[in-house]
Curated annotation (Swiss-Prot):
This is Probable cobalt-precorrin-5A hydrolase. The keyword Hydrolase applies. The keyword Hydrolase applies. The gene is cbiG. It holds the Pfam family CbiG_C. It is an enzyme of class 3 (hydrolase).
């Protein structure tokens, strides 16, 4: 997902560079552009404009907005570092990125959505936060209105460790589904973590690499469905002990399965890894294959939400279903 950061003034450029540092740290693809060079390419996941709201509304918004369920987010940031999410705040991640950035540049968020102003979590934001299928339009309107007046029931799979959420009365059941207001059923999307590591890697290095990767995407361990790696690493103690500690299944893939992905998906290739393992990479293709195995979906319905993350001899990638 590409995020474009657009500025006009020298002060705006300085803030844009601060925002870029935050997005780089969290491993989100991003690009800083002066307004004179800025073009909408329609493959962006979000826009951060450091300028007056009126400029964005008049010059760009009509070209960006199209569908509430698919629009990229749009955030306005002024030169006091006040961030205002104005489009696709919940499903597109506008509120999430506003908070993420503000917390890291000593800024503040000005919310305009009723649920957020009142400290509540709307059902659309809930689905984004917990990686659930997207609610229907009618359900978003109904629940987000109701939650402003009273707590809404929320039933979760019993091993999920979410205890408190403002606006909801939480209970648990044995089913692998989330039920909102006793009637709205939302299917959890499968999440898989792909792992690669050098030979003889220590457990603590694998463990902390995984923890950091999950932190970067705000995913609790209990929300992960499976880990995955290549057959060459199936006896690697550092990987086995880490996966066992997290109490999750480990899916093993053959070299041929890993290599097949590179013929179908444009992934980063490492000649160094190919020289030693006979594949161009492990963590990214393993995570994608694991989601495919868990869902039986085609590759077009799967996406990487964290590209290959390297730390202390370990590589980690995270994939999930693409709605």
């Amino acid at each position: 997902m590409m995020i474009k950061i657009v500025y006009i003034t020298k002060r705006g450029k300085k803030i844009a560079e601060e925002i870029k540092d935050v997005l780089d740290y969290y491993h989100y693809d991003n690009k800083v552009e002066p307004i004179k060079d800025f073009k909408i390419e329609r493959n962006e996941g979000g826009f951060i404009f450091i300028m007056a709201t009126g400029i964005v509304l008049r010059k760009f918004l009509d070209e960006i907005k199209n569908d509430k369920f698919k629009d990229p987010f749009v955030i306005i940031c002024n030169e006091n570092k006040e961030l205002i999410p104005i489009l696709s705040n919940h499903l597109g991640g506008g509120n999430y990125f506003s908070k993420l950035i503000a917390n890291n540049i000593n800024g503040r968020v000005i919310f305009t959505t009723a649920t957020d102003v009142n400290g509540k979590v709307g059902i659309d934001e809930l689905s984004k936060m917990l990686f659930l299928e997207t609610p229907k339009r009618k359900h978003i309107l109904d629940i987000n209105k109701k939650i402003l007046e009273e707590d809404v029931s929320l039933t979760l799979p019993k091993y999920w460790k979410l205890r408190n959420l403002n606006g909801y009365k939480i209970s648990y059941h044995d089913k692998y589904e989330v039920v909102v207001d006793d009637s709205i059923r939302l299917k959890p999307l499968k999440i898989a973590v792909g792992l690669g590591a050098r030979k003889g890697i220590e457990r603590y290095k694998v463990y902390w690499a995984v923890k950091k990767a999950l932190f970067l995407r705000n995913i609790p361990v209990w929300r992960v469905d499976a880990f995955a790696t290549i057959e060459d690493k199936k006896h690697e103690r550092g990987i086995l002990e880490t996966v066992n500690k997290f109490k999750k299944p480990l899916i093993i893939f053959k070299r041929e399965e890993i290599n097949e992905i590179y013929e179908k998906i444009d992934l980063e290739k490492s000649e160094f890894v190919y020289k030693h393992l006979g594949v161009y990479g492990v963590s990214e293709p393993a995570s994608i294959l694991a989601v495919k195995k868990l869902t039986n979906k085609d590759f077009d319905s799967i996406k990487l939400i964290l590209k290959k993350f390297k730390r202390n001899g370990v590589t980690v990638a995270i994939a999930t279903e693409n709605l």
